[in-house]
């Protein structure tokens, strides 16, 4: 099978209020996440190691591109995420008022995902997956129901998530998105038509009430079993779940954790169950995995971003002594942060031109700004390039490079500061919150022990704002272990090239021991000659922990001196930077290829 699972249906943008305890009316800022039951399950399933595709539509606008790009980043196949030129991507506002109140307002009238049609797929696509999952909302309208039934007809197995939202069936006023149950014979009849076709049905007790046409759970299940041979999975919140297969009933206890946010927990539960069910695991194991995923998601802000990774799930299941408030577990949150939602960077070849003091010696601010724009223009001609750019003189260059899929970092340190100081002042978290999420936080530190406090403040700010951190140490024998011992675990290190394989092995050993999820090491340049850099590359390329380089003055400084002296034209600067950068890229890749060939 090409896919383990195809998820069909809702795909939206969730705007989550960030003020916990406030009414939705009183929210002053929102976090933007991917949302929609099937999209959440797609992300959760992909994070648990399944091959997943999404079948839906999005608008031809910014939110639609956000949905598609987020799914793709999560490893979900988006080849069947169609762009609808006439409709907008669905939108939902949500908030957390208290432990029992979770207001939400849907903006879904004539939205893109409700226009999904049989023209968006073929039998071969549906048949290429072990199972097709569709949620109940898409059976609320005739045209989408027709498309979904056409897909179900071609599915190897059909998973039905009841996903009952009365407001989306037109049973409440538009502002009552939070209401979970309204009895309706019409809805019951429609859902039962679908359940006759299902192999697996997942829902809350309230959802089985509407599906079975009775507010007595046992009676509702009996009615459903008379018309469907599907395995029925009843989500019971903190109590866990029950699984009903024929005459067999399995009860699986939940995990004792604080309920922080119920929104999305059921989707995490479904992903956890499917991660076992699609592999033929015993139903008891499927239920245990489902309850664990639900417990992890219910402890967090957001839906899709809260879904656990496989590593995180296994860690959670390996122990029973977790804090009641799971989100306060440093270990779990660290593993979650470093194993989910991150683009893979197997190679980073960055041109570092965040230099400030060195260029201030050559010319006035406006000339520095102009020069950095030229460097950025040279870099844009390369696919897969990376850059480190400052805000002070490189803001325009930074804007030009952002949003292009490049690896980008920007500095926070005051150049040359000893002890370490930040350009944005002490409230570094507030400054980082205004940065694009794709920007890596780079901090060059002339390390002394007194800098550990500042580095820890910076690390905590990066964790709180969801930013990656690169620490640059311009010294031989960098004190990585000492920094790790202070609770600081950067995503990246930027280091001078060690002189021996033994020195590289020592660095690898420390990183693997202290933070196996570290992205890796980038080599700095220190205005070394190309020959010197190539020798360093040849050694570094033998060690997988080194992912590439972040070199600056070796590439652009000669051109800068001539350009600031009016001895070089703009075009010549661009040409020289292009040539020097391309030469280093070729040297690195040649060194890495030689190592790979020697291993094979």
Put a short name on every predicted segment.
Residues 325-450, 489, 531-547, 557-600:
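Alpha/beta catalytic barrel-like cores
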Residues 371-377, 426-440, 448, 454-455, ...:
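Alpha/beta enzyme core
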Residues 351, 472, 493, 552:
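Conserved, mostly hydrophobic/aromatic
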Residues 51-136, 314-323:
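Conserved N-terminal subdomain of the carbohydrate kinase-like
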Residues 171-173, 180-192, 215, 398-400, ...:
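Distinct, well-ordered alpha-helical segments
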Residues 1-6, 186, 213-331:
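Conserved phosphate-binding/catalytic region of the ribokinase-like
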Residues 131-223, 230, 239-240, 472:
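Conserved beta-alpha-beta core of the PfkB/ribokinase-like small-molecule kinase fold
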């Amino acid at each position: 099978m090409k896919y383990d699972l195809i998820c069909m249906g809702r795909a939206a943008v969730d705007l989550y209020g960030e003020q916990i305890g406030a009414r939705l009316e009183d929210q002053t800022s929102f976090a933007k996440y991917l949302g929609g039951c099937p999209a959440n399950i797609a992300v959760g399933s992909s994070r648990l190691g399944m091959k997943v595709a999404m079948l839906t539509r999005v608008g031809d606008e910014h939110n639609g591109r956000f949905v598609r790009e987020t799914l793709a980043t999560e490893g979900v196949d988006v080849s069947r995420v169609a762009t609808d030129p006439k409709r907008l991507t669905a939108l939902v506002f949500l908030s957390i008022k208290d432990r029992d109140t979770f207001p939400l307002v849907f903006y879904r009238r004539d939205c893109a995902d409700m226009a999904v049609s049989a023209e968006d797929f073929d039998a071969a696509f549906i048949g290429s997956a072990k199972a097709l999952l569709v949620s109940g909302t898409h059976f609320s309208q005739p045209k989408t129901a027709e498309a979904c039934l056409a897909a179900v007809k071609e599915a190897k197995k059909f998973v039905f998530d009841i996903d009952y939202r009365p407001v989306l069936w037109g049973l409440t006023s538009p502002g009552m998105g939070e209401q979970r149950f309204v009895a309706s014979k019409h809805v019951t009849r429609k859902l039962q038509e679908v359940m006759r076709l299902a192999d697996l049905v997942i829902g809350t007790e309230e959802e089985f009430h509407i599906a079975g046409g009775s507010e007595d759970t046992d009676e509702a299940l009996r009615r459903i079993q008379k018309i469907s041979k599907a395995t029925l999975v009843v989500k019971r919140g903190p109590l866990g779940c029950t699984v009903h297969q024929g005459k067999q009933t399995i009860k699986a206890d939940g995990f004792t954790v604080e309920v922080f946010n119920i929104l999305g927990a059921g989707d995490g539960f479904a992903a956890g169950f499917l991660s076992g069910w699609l592999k033929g695991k015993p139903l008891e194991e499927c239920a245990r995995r489902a309850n664990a995923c639900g417990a992890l998601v219910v402890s967090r802000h957001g839906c899709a971003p809260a879904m656990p990774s496989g590593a995180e799930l296994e860690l959670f299941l390996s122990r029973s002594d977790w804090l009641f408030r799971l989100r306060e577990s440093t270990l779990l949150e660290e593993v979650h942060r470093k194993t989910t939602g991150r683009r893979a960077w197997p190679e980073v070849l960055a041109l570092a031109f965040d230099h400030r003091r060195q260029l201030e010696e050559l010319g006035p601010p406006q000339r520095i700004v102009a020069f950095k724009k030229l460097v950025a223009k040279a870099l844009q001609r390369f696919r897969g390039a990376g850059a480190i750019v400052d805000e002070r003189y490189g803001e325009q260059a930074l804007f030009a490079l952002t949003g292009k899929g490049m690896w980008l970092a920007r500095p926070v340190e005051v150049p040359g500061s000893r002890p370490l100081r930040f350009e944005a002042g002490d409230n570094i978290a507030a400054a980082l919150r205004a940065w694009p999420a794709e920007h890596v936080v780079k901090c060059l530190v002339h390390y002394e022990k007194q800098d550990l406090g500042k580095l820890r403040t910076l690390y905590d700010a990066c964790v709180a704002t969801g930013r990656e951190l690169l620490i640059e140490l311009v010294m031989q024998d960098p004190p990585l272990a000492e920094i790790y011992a202070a609770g600081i675990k950067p995503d990246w290190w930027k280091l001078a090239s060690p002189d021996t394989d033994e020195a590289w092995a020592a660095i690898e050993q420390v990183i693997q021991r202290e933070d196996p999820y570290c992205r890796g090491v980038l080599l700095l340049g220190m205005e070394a000659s190309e020959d010197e850099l190539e020798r360093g590359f040849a050694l570094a390329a033998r060690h997988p922990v080194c992912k590439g380089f972040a070199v600056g003055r070796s590439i652009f400084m000669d051109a800068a001196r001539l350009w600031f002296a009016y001895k070089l034209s703009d075009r010549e600067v661009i040409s020289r930077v292009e040539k020097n950068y391309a030469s280093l890229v070729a040297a690195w890749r040649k060194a890495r290829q030689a190592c790979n060939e020697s291993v094979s």
